[in-house]
Protein backbone atom coordinates (compact mmCIF):
# COMPACT_ATOMS: atom_id res chain seq x y z
CA UNK A 1 0.00 0.00 0.00
CA UNK A 2 1.29 3.46 -0.92
CA UNK A 3 0.56 6.43 1.35
CA UNK A 4 1.31 10.08 0.58
CA UNK A 5 3.09 12.33 3.10
CA UNK A 6 2.41 16.02 2.58
CA UNK A 7 0.89 18.43 5.13
CA UNK A 8 -0.72 15.23 6.44
CA UNK A 9 -0.42 11.54 5.65
CA UNK A 10 -3.09 10.27 3.26
CA UNK A 11 -4.00 6.57 3.56
CA UNK A 12 -6.09 5.02 0.74
CA UNK A 13 -9.42 3.90 2.20
CA UNK A 14 -9.65 1.02 -0.29
CA UNK A 15 -6.48 -0.57 1.11
CA UNK A 16 -7.52 -0.82 4.77
CA UNK A 17 -10.44 -2.56 6.45
CA UNK A 18 -13.26 -0.70 8.23
CA UNK A 19 -11.91 -2.14 11.49
CA UNK A 20 -8.49 -0.55 10.91
CA UNK A 21 -10.17 2.75 10.01
CA UNK A 22 -12.10 2.76 13.29
CA UNK A 23 -8.99 1.80 15.27
CA UNK A 24 -7.08 4.73 13.77
CA UNK A 25 -9.94 7.17 14.40
CA UNK A 26 -10.24 6.02 18.01
CA UNK A 27 -6.51 6.44 18.53
CA UNK A 28 -6.64 10.01 17.19
CA UNK A 29 -9.74 11.13 19.10
CA UNK A 30 -9.05 13.17 22.23
CA UNK A 31 -11.47 14.27 24.94
CA UNK A 32 -10.73 17.08 27.37
CA UNK A 33 -12.12 17.70 30.83
CA UNK A 34 -11.68 20.64 33.18
CA UNK A 35 -10.93 18.49 36.24
CA UNK A 36 -10.24 14.77 36.22
CA UNK A 37 -11.26 14.54 39.87
CA UNK A 38 -14.84 15.47 39.00
CA UNK A 39 -15.01 12.64 36.47
CA UNK A 40 -13.58 10.14 38.95
CA UNK A 41 -16.47 10.84 41.31
CA UNK A 42 -19.10 10.45 38.57
CA UNK A 43 -21.10 7.23 38.21
CA UNK A 44 -20.71 7.40 34.41
CA UNK A 45 -16.90 7.57 34.37
CA UNK A 46 -16.52 4.01 33.04
CA UNK A 47 -18.62 4.92 29.99
CA UNK A 48 -17.22 8.32 29.11
CA UNK A 49 -17.74 9.95 26.72
CA UNK A 50 -21.53 9.53 26.56
CA UNK A 51 -24.60 11.79 26.37
CA UNK A 52 -24.29 12.64 30.05
CA UNK A 53 -20.67 13.76 29.57
CA UNK A 54 -21.52 15.96 26.60
CA UNK A 55 -24.02 17.94 28.68
CA UNK A 56 -21.64 18.27 31.66
CA UNK A 57 -19.87 21.56 32.38
CA UNK A 58 -16.69 19.61 33.14
CA UNK A 59 -16.49 18.36 29.54
CA UNK A 60 -14.40 20.76 27.44
CA UNK A 61 -14.75 19.18 24.04
CA UNK A 62 -13.58 16.47 21.69
CA UNK A 63 -10.99 16.72 18.93
CA UNK A 64 -10.73 14.21 16.08
CA UNK A 65 -7.41 14.38 14.26
CA UNK A 66 -8.25 11.67 11.69
CA UNK A 67 -10.76 12.42 8.96
CA UNK A 68 -11.95 11.00 5.65
CA UNK A 69 -11.20 13.18 2.61
CA UNK A 70 -11.56 12.91 -1.14
CA UNK A 71 -8.70 13.79 -3.49
CA UNK A 72 -9.69 13.52 -7.12
CA UNK A 73 -11.82 10.41 -7.41
CA UNK A 74 -10.16 8.55 -4.50
CA UNK A 75 -11.00 8.53 -0.81
CA UNK A 76 -8.32 8.73 1.87
CA UNK A 77 -8.02 8.66 5.63
CA UNK A 78 -6.11 11.81 6.54
CA UNK A 79 -3.94 11.60 9.68
CA UNK A 80 -1.41 14.05 11.20
CA UNK A 81 2.22 13.66 10.20
CA UNK A 82 3.38 13.75 13.83
CA UNK A 83 1.42 10.65 14.73
CA UNK A 84 1.90 8.88 11.37
CA UNK A 85 4.82 6.61 12.43
CA UNK A 86 2.60 5.06 15.10
CA UNK A 87 -0.35 4.79 12.69
CA UNK A 88 1.81 3.14 10.02
CA UNK A 89 3.07 0.62 12.60
CA UNK A 90 -0.54 -0.12 13.51
CA UNK A 91 -1.32 -0.88 9.86
CA UNK A 92 1.83 -2.96 9.34
CA UNK A 93 1.07 -5.00 12.47
CA UNK A 94 -2.05 -6.16 10.63
CA UNK A 95 0.01 -7.58 7.77
CA UNK A 96 -0.16 -4.66 5.32
CA UNK A 97 3.13 -3.43 3.84
CA UNK A 98 3.30 0.37 3.71
CA UNK A 99 5.36 2.49 1.30
CA UNK A 100 5.53 6.23 2.04
CA UNK A 101 5.70 8.67 -0.86
CA UNK A 102 7.25 11.80 0.65
CA UNK A 103 6.00 14.99 -1.04
CA UNK A 104 7.62 17.39 1.42
CA UNK A 105 9.10 20.48 -0.26
CA UNK A 106 12.78 20.71 -1.17
CA UNK A 107 13.69 24.35 -1.76
CA UNK A 108 17.35 25.17 -1.20
CA UNK A 109 18.42 28.80 -0.97
CA UNK A 110 21.77 30.55 -1.22
CA UNK A 111 23.80 29.17 1.73
CA UNK A 112 24.46 31.23 4.83
CA UNK A 113 26.62 30.35 7.82
CA UNK A 114 26.33 30.31 11.60
CA UNK A 115 29.25 32.12 13.24
CA UNK A 116 28.25 32.05 16.90
CA UNK A 117 29.55 29.92 19.75
CA UNK A 118 27.63 27.09 21.38
CA UNK A 119 26.88 26.61 25.04
CA UNK A 120 27.01 23.14 26.62
CA UNK A 121 24.22 20.90 25.36
CA UNK A 122 23.32 22.95 22.29
CA UNK A 123 25.28 20.88 19.75
CA UNK A 124 23.58 17.68 20.95
CA UNK A 125 20.17 19.34 20.59
CA UNK A 126 20.94 20.47 17.03
CA UNK A 127 22.06 16.95 16.11
CA UNK A 128 18.77 15.58 17.47
CA UNK A 129 16.76 18.01 15.32
CA UNK A 130 18.72 17.02 12.22
CA UNK A 131 18.29 13.34 12.99
CA UNK A 132 14.56 13.24 13.76
CA UNK A 133 13.43 16.11 11.47
CA UNK A 134 10.07 16.42 13.27
CA UNK A 135 9.22 16.81 16.93
CA UNK A 136 9.51 19.02 19.97
CA UNK A 137 12.75 20.21 21.52
CA UNK A 138 12.19 20.57 25.25
CA UNK A 139 14.57 23.29 26.31
CA UNK A 140 14.32 25.23 29.60
CA UNK A 141 13.91 29.01 29.47
CA UNK A 142 17.19 30.79 28.71
CA UNK A 143 18.75 27.70 27.10
CA UNK A 144 19.25 29.47 23.77
CA UNK A 145 16.40 28.17 21.62
CA UNK A 146 16.86 31.01 19.11
CA UNK A 147 20.57 30.21 18.81
CA UNK A 148 19.90 26.51 18.20
CA UNK A 149 17.09 27.24 15.76
CA UNK A 150 19.22 29.72 13.83
CA UNK A 151 22.10 27.26 13.66
CA UNK A 152 19.77 24.55 12.34
CA UNK A 153 18.48 26.86 9.61
CA UNK A 154 22.04 27.80 8.62
CA UNK A 155 23.08 24.16 8.49
CA UNK A 156 20.18 23.26 6.19
CA UNK A 157 20.15 26.50 4.14
CA UNK A 158 16.60 25.96 2.96
CA UNK A 159 13.58 28.25 2.78
CA UNK A 160 12.35 28.64 6.36
CA UNK A 161 9.19 29.71 8.18
CA UNK A 162 9.42 30.63 11.87
CA UNK A 163 6.09 30.87 13.71
CA UNK A 164 5.27 32.27 17.14
CA UNK A 165 2.26 33.71 18.91
CA UNK A 166 4.04 36.94 19.90
CA UNK A 167 6.02 39.36 17.77
CA UNK A 168 8.65 39.80 20.50
CA UNK A 169 9.71 36.16 20.19
CA UNK A 170 10.11 36.53 16.44
CA UNK A 171 12.23 39.63 16.94
CA UNK A 172 14.49 37.50 19.14
CA UNK A 173 15.08 35.20 16.17
CA UNK A 174 15.69 38.12 13.82
CA UNK A 175 18.15 39.62 16.29
CA UNK A 176 20.03 36.32 16.47
CA UNK A 177 20.25 36.10 12.67
CA UNK A 178 21.22 39.68 11.81
CA UNK A 179 22.10 41.35 15.13
CA UNK A 180 20.97 44.54 16.88
CA UNK A 181 22.44 47.52 18.70
CA UNK A 182 23.27 45.35 21.71
CA UNK A 183 23.84 41.92 20.16
CA UNK A 184 26.14 40.92 17.30
CA UNK A 185 24.74 38.86 14.45
CA UNK A 186 25.31 35.14 14.89
CA UNK A 187 24.94 34.40 11.16
CA UNK A 188 26.12 36.00 7.93
CA UNK A 189 22.56 36.17 6.55
CA UNK A 190 21.88 39.36 4.60
CA UNK A 191 19.23 41.33 6.57
CA UNK A 192 17.30 41.75 3.32
CA UNK A 193 16.64 37.99 3.27
CA UNK A 194 14.71 37.85 6.57
CA UNK A 195 11.45 39.63 7.38
CA UNK A 196 8.34 39.60 9.55
CA UNK A 197 6.01 38.61 6.72
CA UNK A 198 2.36 39.52 6.24
CA UNK A 199 1.69 39.35 2.51
CA UNK A 200 2.08 36.68 -0.15
CA UNK A 201 4.85 38.74 -1.75
CA UNK A 202 6.70 38.90 1.60
CA UNK A 203 6.66 35.11 1.93
CA UNK A 204 7.64 34.65 -1.69
CA UNK A 205 10.64 36.98 -1.72
CA UNK A 206 12.34 36.17 1.62
CA UNK A 207 14.39 33.11 2.54
CA UNK A 208 13.69 33.28 6.28
CA UNK A 209 10.10 34.28 6.94
CA UNK A 210 8.87 35.25 10.41
CA UNK A 211 5.14 35.22 11.11
CA UNK A 212 2.75 35.28 14.04
CA UNK A 213 0.15 32.50 14.06
CA UNK A 214 -2.51 35.22 14.24
CA UNK A 215 -1.56 36.14 10.65
CA UNK A 216 -3.49 33.06 9.52
CA UNK A 217 -6.60 33.33 11.72
CA UNK A 218 -8.77 35.49 9.44
CA UNK A 219 -10.43 34.33 6.19
CA UNK A 220 -7.72 36.21 4.30
CA UNK A 221 -5.09 34.58 6.49
CA UNK A 222 -6.49 31.12 5.76
CA UNK A 223 -6.24 31.86 2.05
CA UNK A 224 -2.64 33.01 2.53
CA UNK A 225 -1.82 29.84 4.48
CA UNK A 226 -3.19 27.69 1.69
CA UNK A 227 -1.08 29.55 -0.88
CA UNK A 228 2.21 29.07 1.01
CA UNK A 229 1.52 25.49 2.16
CA UNK A 230 4.31 23.85 0.14
CA UNK A 231 6.90 26.63 0.18
CA UNK A 232 8.96 25.84 3.27
CA UNK A 233 11.40 22.99 3.84
CA UNK A 234 12.00 24.12 7.42
CA UNK A 235 9.27 25.20 9.84
CA UNK A 236 10.15 26.24 13.40
CA UNK A 237 7.46 26.96 15.99
CA UNK A 238 8.52 28.91 19.08
CA UNK A 239 6.89 28.29 22.48
CA UNK A 240 4.36 25.79 21.12
CA UNK A 241 2.73 25.39 24.54
CA UNK A 242 1.63 28.98 25.04
CA UNK A 243 -1.23 29.88 22.73
CA UNK A 244 -4.48 28.02 22.17
CA UNK A 245 -3.29 24.53 21.32
CA UNK A 246 -6.21 23.89 19.00
CA UNK A 247 -5.36 27.01 16.96
CA UNK A 248 -1.72 26.00 16.66
CA UNK A 249 -2.80 22.49 15.66
CA UNK A 250 -5.15 23.80 12.96
CA UNK A 251 -2.42 25.92 11.38
CA UNK A 252 0.36 23.34 11.64
CA UNK A 253 -1.92 20.68 10.16
CA UNK A 254 -2.13 22.76 6.97
CA UNK A 255 1.62 23.28 6.45
CA UNK A 256 3.84 20.91 4.50
CA UNK A 257 7.43 20.87 5.77
CA UNK A 258 10.37 18.50 5.69
CA UNK A 259 11.89 19.67 8.98
CA UNK A 260 9.22 20.73 11.50
CA UNK A 261 10.47 21.53 15.00
CA UNK A 262 8.57 22.97 17.96
CA UNK A 263 10.45 24.67 20.81
CA UNK A 264 9.12 24.67 24.34
CA UNK A 265 10.45 25.04 27.85
CA UNK A 266 7.32 23.49 29.33
CA UNK A 267 5.45 21.36 26.76
CA UNK A 268 2.81 20.33 29.30
CA UNK A 269 -0.30 22.49 29.54
CA UNK A 270 -2.79 22.88 32.35
CA UNK A 271 -5.62 21.93 29.94
CA UNK A 272 -3.60 18.88 28.68
CA UNK A 273 -4.04 20.00 25.05
CA UNK A 274 -0.33 19.60 24.35
CA UNK A 275 -1.32 16.22 22.90
CA UNK A 276 -2.87 18.00 19.90
CA UNK A 277 0.34 19.81 18.98
CA UNK A 278 2.49 16.73 19.60
CA UNK A 279 0.35 14.66 17.23
CA UNK A 280 0.67 17.31 14.52
CA UNK A 281 4.38 18.16 14.93
CA UNK A 282 5.69 15.04 16.62
CA UNK A 283 6.82 13.83 20.06
CA UNK A 284 9.55 15.26 22.27
CA UNK A 285 12.80 14.35 20.48
CA UNK A 286 15.34 15.82 22.89
CA UNK A 287 15.38 17.34 26.36
CA UNK A 288 18.04 19.86 27.31
CA UNK A 289 19.53 20.79 30.63
CA UNK A 290 20.82 24.30 31.09
CA UNK A 291 22.91 26.28 33.53
CA UNK A 292 20.97 28.80 35.58
CA UNK A 293 21.44 30.80 38.75
CA UNK A 294 19.92 29.73 42.06
CA UNK A 295 17.20 32.10 43.26
CA UNK A 296 16.92 33.47 46.78
CA UNK A 297 13.48 33.86 48.32
CA UNK A 298 12.36 37.11 49.93
CA UNK A 299 9.00 37.77 51.58
CA UNK A 300 6.91 40.92 51.89
CA UNK A 301 3.54 41.10 53.62
CA UNK A 302 1.12 43.41 51.84
CA UNK A 303 -1.53 43.73 54.54
CA UNK A 304 -4.19 43.00 51.92
CA UNK A 305 -7.01 40.89 53.34
CA UNK A 306 -10.01 39.37 51.61
CA UNK A 307 -12.80 37.11 52.85
CA UNK A 308 -15.15 35.45 50.40
CA UNK A 309 -18.24 33.28 50.71
CA UNK A 310 -19.59 30.88 48.11
CA UNK A 311 -18.69 30.99 44.43
CA UNK A 312 -16.99 34.26 43.48
CA UNK A 313 -15.97 35.08 39.87
CA UNK A 314 -12.22 34.77 39.37
CA UNK A 315 -11.99 38.13 37.60
CA UNK A 316 -13.62 39.78 40.62
CA UNK A 317 -11.00 38.32 42.97
CA UNK A 318 -8.13 39.37 40.70
CA UNK A 319 -9.49 42.88 40.14
CA UNK A 320 -10.01 43.53 43.84
CA UNK A 321 -6.53 42.35 44.79
CA UNK A 322 -4.51 43.97 42.00
CA UNK A 323 -6.20 47.37 42.23
CA UNK A 324 -5.99 47.75 46.01
CA UNK A 325 -4.24 51.09 46.62
CA UNK A 326 -2.39 50.07 49.79
CA UNK A 327 -1.17 46.89 48.13
CA UNK A 328 0.09 48.90 45.14
CA UNK A 329 1.90 51.22 47.57
CA UNK A 330 3.53 48.21 49.21
CA UNK A 331 4.73 46.87 45.85
CA UNK A 332 5.98 50.29 44.73
CA UNK A 333 7.98 50.96 47.91
CA UNK A 334 9.56 47.53 47.79
CA UNK A 335 10.48 47.98 44.13
CA UNK A 336 12.35 51.20 44.93
CA UNK A 337 14.34 49.41 47.64
CA UNK A 338 15.22 46.47 45.39
CA UNK A 339 16.27 48.79 42.57
CA UNK A 340 18.50 50.67 45.03
CA UNK A 341 20.26 47.35 45.69
CA UNK A 342 21.07 46.99 42.00
CA UNK A 343 18.22 44.78 40.81
CA UNK A 344 16.39 44.96 37.49
CA UNK A 345 12.82 44.21 38.63
CA UNK A 346 10.03 42.46 36.70
CA UNK A 347 6.51 42.95 38.05
CA UNK A 348 3.86 40.82 36.29
CA UNK A 349 0.13 41.40 36.65
CA UNK A 350 -2.91 39.44 35.51
CA UNK A 351 -4.82 42.50 34.28
CA UNK A 352 -3.73 45.55 32.31
CA UNK A 353 -5.34 48.28 34.43
CA UNK A 354 -3.06 47.93 37.50
CA UNK A 355 0.07 48.27 35.35
CA UNK A 356 -0.29 52.01 34.87
CA UNK A 357 -1.06 52.53 38.57
CA UNK A 358 1.98 50.57 39.75
CA UNK A 359 4.29 52.39 37.32
CA UNK A 360 2.92 55.80 38.31
CA UNK A 361 3.26 55.05 42.03
CA UNK A 362 6.85 53.78 41.75
CA UNK A 363 7.90 56.87 39.81
CA UNK A 364 5.99 59.23 42.13
CA UNK A 365 7.61 57.80 45.26
CA UNK A 366 11.06 57.68 43.65
CA UNK A 367 10.82 61.21 42.32
CA UNK A 368 12.17 60.02 38.97
CA UNK A 369 11.37 57.52 36.24
CA UNK A 370 12.38 54.03 37.31
CA UNK A 371 9.48 51.91 36.05
CA UNK A 372 7.98 51.51 32.58
CA UNK A 373 4.80 49.91 31.29
CA UNK A 374 5.35 46.86 29.12
CA UNK A 375 2.11 45.85 27.43
CA UNK A 376 0.80 44.68 24.09
CA UNK A 377 -0.44 48.22 23.48
CA UNK A 378 3.06 49.65 23.14
CA UNK A 379 4.15 50.59 19.65
CA UNK A 380 6.60 48.04 18.28
CA UNK A 381 9.68 50.33 18.08
CA UNK A 382 9.12 51.42 21.68
CA UNK A 383 8.76 47.82 22.90
CA UNK A 384 12.02 46.93 21.18
CA UNK A 385 13.73 49.95 22.72
CA UNK A 386 12.49 49.06 26.21
CA UNK A 387 13.94 45.56 25.88
CA UNK A 388 17.31 46.96 24.77
CA UNK A 389 17.35 49.52 27.59
CA UNK A 390 16.45 46.88 30.19
CA UNK A 391 19.34 44.71 28.98
CA UNK A 392 21.68 47.67 29.46
CA UNK A 393 20.10 48.45 32.87
CA UNK A 394 18.97 51.85 31.65
CA UNK A 395 15.48 50.69 32.61
CA UNK A 396 15.37 49.42 36.20
CA UNK A 397 11.82 48.04 36.30
CA UNK A 398 9.26 46.71 33.83
CA UNK A 399 5.63 46.22 34.79
CA UNK A 400 3.50 44.15 32.41
CA UNK A 401 1.06 41.31 32.02
CA UNK A 402 2.41 37.97 33.16
CA UNK A 403 2.00 36.47 29.68
CA UNK A 404 4.28 39.07 28.11
CA UNK A 405 6.86 39.07 30.91
CA UNK A 406 6.90 35.29 31.36
CA UNK A 407 7.73 33.97 27.90
CA UNK A 408 10.08 34.95 25.11
CA UNK A 409 11.48 38.20 26.54
CA UNK A 410 15.27 37.99 26.55
CA UNK A 411 16.57 40.28 29.33
CA UNK A 412 19.56 38.56 30.96
CA UNK A 413 20.03 41.52 33.34
CA UNK A 414 16.62 40.92 35.00
CA UNK A 415 17.38 39.76 38.54
CA UNK A 416 14.25 40.22 40.65
CA UNK A 417 10.79 38.77 40.02
CA UNK A 418 7.75 39.84 42.01
CA UNK A 419 5.24 37.08 42.69
CA UNK A 420 2.12 39.21 42.91
CA UNK A 421 -0.27 37.40 40.56
CA UNK A 422 -3.20 35.15 41.48
CA UNK A 423 -2.04 32.13 39.50
CA UNK A 424 -1.92 28.35 39.87
CA UNK A 425 -0.55 27.27 36.51
CA UNK A 426 2.55 25.10 36.87
CA UNK A 427 3.95 25.35 33.29
CA UNK A 428 3.47 29.13 33.31
CA UNK A 429 5.07 29.42 36.75
CA UNK A 430 8.18 27.61 35.52
CA UNK A 431 8.48 29.97 32.55
CA UNK A 432 7.91 33.04 34.71
CA UNK A 433 10.37 32.16 37.47
CA UNK A 434 13.15 31.28 35.03
CA UNK A 435 13.14 34.81 33.59
CA UNK A 436 15.50 36.13 36.27
CA UNK A 437 17.89 33.16 36.48
CA UNK A 438 20.02 33.70 33.35
CA UNK A 439 23.73 33.71 34.29
CA UNK A 440 25.40 37.06 33.62
CA UNK A 441 28.66 38.54 34.85
CA UNK A 442 28.15 41.24 37.48
CA UNK A 443 24.46 40.48 37.95
CA UNK A 444 23.12 40.54 41.54
CA UNK A 445 22.01 37.29 43.15
CA UNK A 446 18.55 36.71 41.67
CA UNK A 447 15.56 37.18 43.95
CA UNK A 448 12.03 35.85 43.73
CA UNK A 449 9.97 37.99 46.08
CA UNK A 450 6.65 36.65 47.32
CA UNK A 451 4.03 39.20 48.33
CA UNK A 452 1.93 37.61 51.08
CA UNK A 453 -1.76 38.52 51.02
CA UNK A 454 -4.14 37.38 53.75
CA UNK A 455 -6.44 35.75 51.27
CA UNK A 456 -7.29 32.04 51.14
CA UNK A 457 -7.34 31.63 47.36
CA UNK A 458 -4.05 33.49 47.03
CA UNK A 459 -2.40 31.23 49.62
CA UNK A 460 -3.59 28.09 47.86
CA UNK A 461 -2.35 29.25 44.46
CA UNK A 462 1.01 30.36 45.82
CA UNK A 463 1.46 27.14 47.80
CA UNK A 464 0.83 25.06 44.68
CA UNK A 465 3.40 26.88 42.54
CA UNK A 466 5.93 27.10 45.38
CA UNK A 467 5.99 23.41 46.30
CA UNK A 468 5.41 21.95 42.84
CA UNK A 469 7.59 24.27 40.74
CA UNK A 470 9.95 26.57 42.62
CA UNK A 471 11.23 24.11 45.23
CA UNK A 472 11.70 20.94 43.10
CA UNK A 473 12.88 22.62 39.88
CA UNK A 474 14.82 25.72 40.95
CA UNK A 475 15.89 24.67 44.49
CA UNK A 476 15.79 28.18 45.98
CA UNK A 477 17.74 29.48 48.97
CA UNK A 478 15.56 30.68 51.84
CA UNK A 479 16.59 31.69 55.35
CA UNK A 480 15.28 29.64 58.31
CA UNK A 481 13.31 32.65 59.53
CA UNK A 482 11.64 33.26 56.16
CA UNK A 483 11.00 29.55 55.68
CA UNK A 484 9.20 29.39 59.02
CA UNK A 485 7.20 32.51 58.13
CA UNK A 486 6.21 31.15 54.70
CA UNK A 487 5.19 27.74 56.04
CA UNK A 488 3.14 29.41 58.76
CA UNK A 489 1.49 31.59 56.11
CA UNK A 490 0.57 28.55 54.03
CA UNK A 491 -0.87 26.73 57.07
CA UNK A 492 -2.91 29.61 58.43
CA UNK A 493 -6.64 29.75 57.76
CA UNK A 494 -7.73 32.58 60.02
CA UNK A 495 -7.27 36.19 59.02
CA UNK A 496 -3.94 37.25 60.50
CA UNK A 497 -2.92 40.09 58.23
CA UNK A 498 0.14 41.94 59.45
CA UNK A 499 1.29 45.27 58.08
CA UNK A 500 4.92 46.17 57.80
CA UNK A 501 5.96 49.78 58.19
CA UNK A 502 6.94 50.33 54.59
Residue ranges and their predicted role:
Residues 167-200, 365, 369:
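Conserved helix-turn-beta segment of the N-terminal RecA-like "Helicase ATP-binding" lobe
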Residues 201, 357, 369-405:
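Conserved helicase ATPase core of P-loop NTP-dependent helicases/translocases
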Residues 233-234, 241-296:
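Post-DEXD/H (motif II) to motif III coupling segment of the RecA-like Helicase ATP-binding lobe
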Residues 424-444:
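Conserved SF2 helicase motif VI
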Residues 159-169, 320-329, 334-361:
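Conserved strand-helix element at the start of the C-terminal RecA-like helicase core
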Residues 132-153:
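Walker A/P-loop
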Residues 409-422, 447-450:
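A short beta-strand element within the Helicase C-terminal
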Residues 287-345:
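Conserved interdomain linker/interface between the two RecA-like ATPase lobes of SF2 helicase motors
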